[in-house]
Amino acid sequence: MSDERYQQRQQKVKDRVDARVAQAQEERGIIIVFTGNGKGKTTAAFGTAARAVGHGKNVGVVQFIKGTWPNGERNLLEPHGVEFQVMATGFTWETQNREADTAACMAVWQHGKRMLADPLLDMVVLDELTYMVAYDYLPLEEVISALNARPGHQTVIITGRGCHRDILDLVDTVSELRPVKHAFDAGVKAQMGIDY
């Protein structure tokens, strides 16, 4: 391809991008869902949270399922003022106690509702929330109500597999991560700094 043809093609791309950017004038918080069976949902959420913190935004995090064990994202973000509230039971397949898991979910969800109502928070991450709805630990209607009542500038990120259709219908952006290949399938164990 000649330099002239390349320049013409890139100019067409630029014109299309510029037109789309010019059309996007609304400023408000959005709701993002990272879902699917692939690796990287929580990683994507925390990458976005780190970006927000880097721009001086206030961020709150509620982690369902993963428990209180140390992780890199918390080690990085907590010293920068990010509040973490973590479901104390950890992985539900380890506890195998529906009553205790439901109670732990509801306890940490109270912090989630507080964060979603807080006008000082620019972003709230609800990590693994989808499971709480799917397992009936958390009423869907309560989640939707809290999302709808949040301050208009606040962005929310929800992660987890199998996001409920009613939540997907409500949100602004959905990214579905699809597994192509994963080291764990080849017997490589989860690694600090990569997987947690």
Q: Where in the sequence are the language-model features?
A:
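Extreme N-terminal, non-catalytic leader segments
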Residues: 1-30
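Short gly/ser/thr-rich secondary-structure transition/capping motifs
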Residues: 14-17, 105-110, 156-159
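Conserved RecA-like P-loop NTPase ATPase core
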Residues: 42, 125, 171
